[in-house]
UniProtKB/Swiss-Prot annotation:
Mg(2+) 1 binds at residues 417, 419, 462. The gene is lacZ. InterPro entries: B-gal_small/dom_5 (IPR004199), Bact_Beta-galactosidase (IPR050347), Beta-gal/glucu_dom_sf (IPR036156), Gal_mutarotase_sf_dom (IPR011013), Galactose-bd-like_sf (IPR008979), GH-type_carb-bd (IPR014718), Glyco_hydro_2 (IPR006101), Glyco_hydro_2_AS (IPR023232). This is Beta-galactosidase. Na(+) binds at residues 202, 602, 605. Mg(2+) 2 binds at residue 598. GO terms for molecular function: beta-galactosidase activity; carbohydrate binding; magnesium ion binding. Belongs to the glycosyl hydrolase 2 family.
Length: 1024
């Protein structure tokens, strides 16, 4: 044990937090989570241990701008102005200091290992009583599961130790410091340390004791470590559970270890042995270790599909059977290996349906509770995710237990990122930083290696490629050859990774960056000598309204076996709740706390909002990742299961044929399909309607019974096909009414019954409509070529740093947002049964014509206005965001009804999950509340839209809400939006894709750009 004087002054003088060679003082060795049961039955059933006591709750807290400002007296007693805070928590969430959101740029001046003199410091203290029996025998430990960034610990005024690495436990022996009666802990937490240079992850930078604190009482002679490994014969019919157990304390001949394996109430296998390890070298073996091997016949294998778990109980006892203590863990029998270029689980090639997940809570910052963790897992499973990458640090220890039990594959990632360094490997190639990096990797492995859900180790994130990575890769491969190692830094295919694991590589497009090119994922597989599997560690940047082009990745994954999936970036928006002057909550992002530097809304890349409400893009991910694929041939549906281990036992296929959303026939068939098997389902003779309309066949896989992660009736997969329709002609009914045209000085007016239309002859726009005496428009019907920019449109552009290649900057520079209409033509003609208005406009900016729009409006005796639009696009202007029409309707109706793709928001490059049907939703549901406002709520493939008294027909896309595109563009946060008068309607003949391969370069695929020189579309607008 390191002995240091107890005084605060001496500790401050040492400045351990600015010494990369000091990562801890007196911290105990890493190990799996312990509970030290004194009853083996309690260990088997995972009951709360009487030897494990939580110290979570109210602590006293005082904040100082620097450690030097902390008074020495604090070591002995609480300060008079100390506050009360809850542990675990981030102190920034309690009003102390400010959270900082930055992606790449370090929040402190880069001068490793030194940190600013102004180093916010939190002083925590807790007074508690100890069980007196704990003082008489054994060892009492204190466990801090997570403290950011570094801390010194005192107990009863005496210095205990020091720890850093905010994402792994720091555990200390308190036995020599405790006394009968009251005891006082004092924890001095520093916001910045040399460890901060290894923690430059894309997240909020927060501080404090943010994970659990607990006391653990172990016997003097104790289990100090244990590791379980499963091994198999070739066909997995026989397995061996290998348990290596290590003890600490007095090594006595009478000591024995028993390892028993349980499946529920049934003991499957058991073995007992004394200590004395196998021969290691010419000097012998470890005297304090023993390895037991238990044979298991026909083990029930673990996978994310069927997470079968056993329970291993490790007992330390004397020869006569007296139990000293027991530890235990869940065991999953599974094997991970790479063979012939494929990542295999239990001999089957995995397809990773993965997502990156930060530990984030909108109210509690980086504090995770069990309810939130379970909620995340349930949502992931319900949306067909089978894997999660712990980006970019080891998670709360409970997370892995939950992933074991519910079934998720885990990439466990070391808490190492040096993204802001120049070059990025400045520290990771420096031997002075090897000890710090080594502790972050080795301690992660030692804590988490017993979890079956952990199938891959990761050396960290975005830290370049250095010699330290190579050393740590070799260490992991030596101590745990049962798992592959991945690491993206240095080009994603270095010698420090078993898996090609690029981030944001495109499907077909190379990105030839200097030194570290990103090849297309298809090309990467074919590079000379390359035989590793490729799994994207990050792809499909889900920032705001995004995930366009997601289907293209999944087409490639299913086409090329060695393309084994990837991890979407990312799971949850990292917005934080703030409150306005009236106490109303709102969602904040970078810069909203006065934090500098900051990267604005780049912290919000989630498939779900911070409160776990899904983004529309989540449905697209669910559909593309679904485990059942379908093919229609005639009346036969071929259902293919992509499950590797699971036989369908809780699924029905529900099918329905509908004409324009009206059901004509339906049925239900139980699915009986084995792993990777097929089932043919013959449908009855399908109806052939005589009336016009779109005929669609929809199939849905429904789970009738609830599961551990879904409710009864859960829909896990679906598909639609448009069927051939009989030709039919609907003749228009005769009308004896003829609309009347009148001309005034400024307007053409058309009247039919109680309806009137007014076209302004000077502007050439439809300026007003009346039904009776009620005006229908608040603004004229005008062309629209722009959208409130998406995050993907903005890219890396900021007010002080413009990226001219970003879509929004191209549109601004070309004048798309400032274009004004010059009238070229506005005429009116009376036909035999209708009135025809003809207009033409040149949309210009600074004398340059960008678009020419020609329209005809034909108003007939039925009151229907047929609008034909022809748009010519200048050859030298950027591709427009949309080609459509917009106006502000006077009505605010409660609901919107449409026949088209839905129900969720969808865009041309993100619509495979949408279904054609007749949908009816509240107006409020047509708006997607992205925290950073942007274009939203589009519905594609629309044939009919009904809102208030109005109906539109044609083949178009639309969005409808209380917010104009201008307000969306000019507003920084959703809570600042105000409902405008009436309702804004945008009807597009054509709309550009949204992109999403990444959010910092123009990522809309060419096929979804509006690159043509001419566009034509037609609408029918009438009143019901």
């Amino acid at each position: 044990m390191t002995m240091i004087t107890d005084s605060l002054a001496v500790v401050l003088q040492r400045r351990d937090w600015e010494n990369p060679g000091v990562t801890q003082l007196n911290r105990l060795a890493a190990h799996p989570p312990f509970a030290s049961w004194r009853n083996s039955e309690e260990a088997r059933t995972d009951r709360p241990s009487q030897q494990l006591r939580s110290l979570n709750g109210e602590w006293r807290f005082a904040w100082f701008p620097a450690p030097e400002a902390v008074p020495e007296s604090w070591l002995e007693c609480d300060l008079p102005d100390a506050d009360t805070v809850v542990v675990p928590s981030n102190w920034q969430m309690h009003g102390y200091d400010a959270p900082i959101y930055t992606n790449v740029t370090y929040p402190i001046t880069v001068n490793p290992p030194f940190v600013p003199a102004e180093n916010p410091t939190g002083c925590y203290s807790l007074t508690f009583n100890i069980d007196e029996s704990w003082l008489q025998e054994g060892q009492t430990r204190i466990i801090f599961d997570g403290v950011n960034s570094a801390f010194h610990l005192w107990c009863n005024g005496r210095w205990v130790g020091y720890g850093q690495d905010s994402r792994l436990p720091s555990e200390f022996d308190l036995s020599a410091f405790l006394r009968a009666g009251e005891n006082r802990l004092a924890v001095m937490v520093l916001r910045w340390s040399d460890g901060s240079y290894l923690e430059d992850q894309d997240m909020w930078r927060m501080s404090g004791i943010f994970r659990d604190v607990s006391l653990l009482h172990k016997p003097t002679t104790q289990i100090s470590d244990f590791q379980v490994t499963t091994r198999f014969n070739d066909d997995f019919s026989r397995a061996v559970l290998e348990a290596e157990v290590q003890m600490y304390g007095e090594l006595r001949d009478e000591l024995r270890v028993t390892v028993s394996l349980w499946q529920g109430e049934t003991q499957v296998a058991s073995g007992t042995a004394p200590f004395g390890g196998e021969i290691i070298d010419e000097r012998g073996g470890y005297a304090d270790r023993v390895t037991l091997r238990l044979n298991v016949e026909n083990p029930e294998l673990w996978s994310a599909e069927i997470p079968n778990l056993y329970r291993a109980v490790v007992e330390l006892h004397t020869a006569d059977g007296t139990l000293i203590e027991a530890e235990a863990c869940d065991v999953g029998f599974r094997e991970v290996r790479i063979e012939n270029g494929l990542l295999l689980l239990n001999g089957k090639p995995l397809l990773i349906r993965g997502v990156n997940r930060h530990e984030h809570h909108p109210l509690h910052g980086q504090v995770m509770d069990e309810q939130t963790m379970v909620q995340d897992i349930l949502l992931m499973k319900q949306n067909n995710f089978n894997a999660v990458r712990c980006s970019h640090y080891p998670n709360h220890p409970l997370w892995y237990t939950l992933c074991d039990r519910y079934g998720l594959y885990v990439v466990d990632e070391a808490n190492i990122e040096t993204h802001g360094m120049v070059p990025m490997n400045r520290l990771t190639d420096d031997p002075r930083w090897l000890p710090a990096m080594s502790e972050r990797v080795t301690r992660m492995v030692q804590r988490d290696r017993n979890h079956p859900s952990v199938i891959i180790w990761s050396l960290g994130n975005e830290s370049g490629h250095g010699a330290n990575h190579d050393a740590l890769y070799r260490w992991i491969k030596s101590v745990d050859p049962s798992r592959p190692v991945q690491y993206e830094g240095g080009g994603a295919d270095t010698t420090a990774t078993d898996i090609i694991c690029p981030m944001y590589a495109r499907v077909d497009e190379d990105q030839p960056f200097p030194a570290v090119p990103k090849w297309s994922i298809k090309k990467w597989l074919s590079l000379p000598g390359e035989m590793r599997p490729l799994i994207l560690c990050e792809y499909a940047h889900a920032m705001g309204n995004s995930l366009g082009g997601f289907a293209k990745y999944w087409q490639a994954f299913r086409q090329y076996p060695r393309l084994q999936g990837g991890f979407v970036w990312d799971w949850v928006d990292q917005s934080l709740i703030k409150y306005d002057e009236n106490g109303n909550p709102w969602s904040a992002y970078g810069g909203d706390f006065g934090d500098t530097p900051n990267d604005r809304q780049f912290c919000m890349n989630g498939l779900v909002f911070a409160d776990r409400t899904p983004h529309p893009a989540l449905t697209e991910a669910k559909h593309q990742q679904q485990f059942f694929q379908f093919r229609l041939s005639g009346r036969t549906i071929e259902v293919t299961s992509e499950y590797l281990f699971r036989h369908s036992d809780n699924e029905f296929l529900h099918w329905m044929v509908a004409l324009d959303g009206k059901p004509l026939a339906s049925g239900e068939v139980p699915l009986d399909v084995g792993p990777q098997g097929k089932q043919l389902i013959e449908l009855p003779e399908l109806p052939q309607p005589e009336s016009a309309g779109q005929l669609w066949l929809t199939v849905r896989v429904v789970q009738p019974n609830a599961t551990a992660w879904s409710e009864a009736g859960h829909i896990s997969a679906w598909q639609q096909w448009r069927l051939a329709e009989n030709l039919s002609v609907t003749l228009p009914s005769a009308s004896h009414a003829i609309p009347q045209l009148t001309t005034s000085g400024t307007d053409f007016c058309i009247e039919l019954g109680n309806k009137r239309w007014q076209f302004n002859r000077q502007s050439g726009f439809l300026s007003q409509m009346w039904i009776g005496d009620e005006k229908q428009l608040l603004t004229p019907l005008r062309d629209q070529f722009t959208r409130a920019p998406l995050d993907n449109d903005i890219g890396v552009s900021e007010a002080t740093r413009i990226d001219p290649n970003a879509w929004v900057e191209r549109w601004k520079a070309a004048g798309h947002y400032q274009a004004e209409a010059a009238l070229l033509q506005c005429t009116a003609d009376t036909l035999a049964d209708a009135v025809l208005i003809t207009t033409a406009h040149a949309w210009q900016h600074q004398g340059k014509t960008l678009f020419i729009s020609r329209k005809t409006y034909r108003i007939d005796g039925h009151g229907e206005m047929v609008i034909n639009v022809d748009v010519a696009v200048a050859s030298d202007t950027p591709h427009p965001a949309r080609v459509g029409l917009t106006c502000q309707l006077a009505q605010v109706a409660e609901r919107v009804n449409w026949l088209g793709l839905g129900p969720q928001e969808n865009y041309p490059d993100r619509l495979t999950a949408a279904c054609f049907d007749r949908w009816d939703l509240p107006l409020s549901d047509m708006y997607t509340p992205y925290v950073f406002p942007s274009e939203n709520g589009l519905r594609c493939g629309t044939r009919e839209l009904n809102y208030g008294p109005h109906q539109w027909r044609g083949d178009f896309q639309f969005n409808i809400s209380r917010y104009s595109q201008q307000q969306l563009m000019e507003t920084s946060h959703r809570h600042l939006l105000h409902a405008e008068e009436g309702t804004w309607l945008n009807i597009d003949g054509f709309h550009m894709g949204i992109g999403g391969d990444d959010s910092w370069s123009p990522s809309v695929s060419a096929e979804f750009q509006l690159s043509a020189g001419h566009y034509h579309y037609q609408l029918v607008w009438c009143q019901k």
